[in-house]
Amino acid sequence: MDIDLLWSFGGWFFILFPETINYCMAKLRSTSQISHFTNPRSCSSLFFVALLIITILITMLQSSTSMEVTSLPTHQPTSSNSHDESSTSSTATTTTDLHPKRTHHQSHPKPTRSFEAGAHEVPSGPNPISNR
């Protein structure tokens, strides 16, 4: 097992649990090569930094979802029940054009011009230039 590969994929268990080093294929000459967290402040500071990063990520995700919810049109309740269902359904199905300057293209455009294939001279023979 390659030790560099373990470090790149989170080999922190070697630092936290030094007895797991015995399960590696390569044996270390001494245990002094491994740095241990002897200072409890460094462990707690790493914990708080990780907690801060997770908190920031969660707030960013919540703010992006709340922006999506507020950008959706809301249905206003009508004050009177005299409106028919078609008028309320037409207001509920309105959409917002996100790109107002873009023109809408048809998926299959109608052919507006026809190719003018009138009568024309067709050369005959293997070499049309010499047939003139």
Swiss-Prot record:
- List, as start-end ranges, the regions of compositional bias called Polar residues: 68-77
Glycosylation positions in this chain? 126
Query: Region annotation Disordered: residue ranges?
Result: 68-132
Mind telling me which residue stretches traverse the membrane in this protein? 42-62
Q: Does the keyword Transmembrane helix apply?
A: yes
Identify residues that carry Hydroxyproline: 123, 126
Q: What is the effect of changing residue 128 to A?
A: Impaired repression of tracheary element differentiation
Extent of Low complexity compositional bias? 87-96
Gene Ontology annotations of biological process type: cell-cell signaling involved in cell fate commitment; phloem or xylem histogenesis; procambium histogenesis; xylem development
* Ranges of Basic residues composition bias in the record: 101-111
This protein's superkingdom?
Eukaryota
Q: Which UniProt keywords apply?
A: Cell membrane, Developmental protein, Differentiation, Glycoprotein, Hydroxylation, Membrane, Secreted, Signal, Transmembrane, Transmembrane helix
Signal peptide stretch: 1-26
Asked if the keyword Cytoplasm belongs to this entry, the reply reads: no
Q: Which GO terms describe its cellular component?
A: apoplast; plasma membrane
Alphabetized InterPro entries for the sequence: CLE41/42/44 (IPR037495)
UniProt similarity note: Belongs to the CLV3/ESR signal peptide family.
Q: What is this protein called?
A: CLAVATA3/ESR (CLE)-related protein TDIF
- Organism from which the protein derives: Zinnia elegans (Garden zinnia)
Gene this chain is encoded by: TDIF
